[in-house]
């Protein structure tokens, strides 16, 4: 299966340049109550290995669900995503053989009465989905925290997306380094 997610990557919001403008391909996006200016990196991660197989770069204002079906490689039967991917199975580009396991919205989950059997089972199902979805966050941690890639380096989506492809390929090597070294020692 595939786990999908997206992260915001900031772009310089300064207009102190020759043109006196921000990057026209980057856009504003709201996360919680905080506004960001930049791009989004959408990734598809293998649910078993945790390695990235698909990377897409878009403007910051592109909704996650619009990219959901482009992040699938085509051979999976199940896909997981957070609440931002609700409705991915109903989209016109949805693949009929893929079963989507989308997280419940946090506000709806808080309203569950865990003393009732049905709600307790629903909450346990959501916990299981969260455990599977956690693998998609690891490549973001490597790129943003390990290597400090929190702000784009170039103007325009094309160059930045090309750099994202390279960074996520390197993050795959970083995350699989122990398995790769064990293969060399054997």
What does each model-found stretch correspond to?
Residues 1-96, 105, 165-171, 178-179, ...:
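Polybasic low-complexity intrinsically disordered regions
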Residues 77-78, 83-162:
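Helix-centered, glycine/charged polyanion-binding patches within enzymatic domains
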Residues 123, 129-131, 167, 174, ...:
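Acidic, contiguous segments within the catalytic cores of piggyBac-derived transposases
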Residues 138, 142, 168, 172-175:
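Alpha-helical scaffold segments in soluble metabolic enzymes
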Residues 145, 149-152, 175, 179-182, ...:
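Intrinsically disordered or highly flexible coil/loop and linker segments, enriched in small
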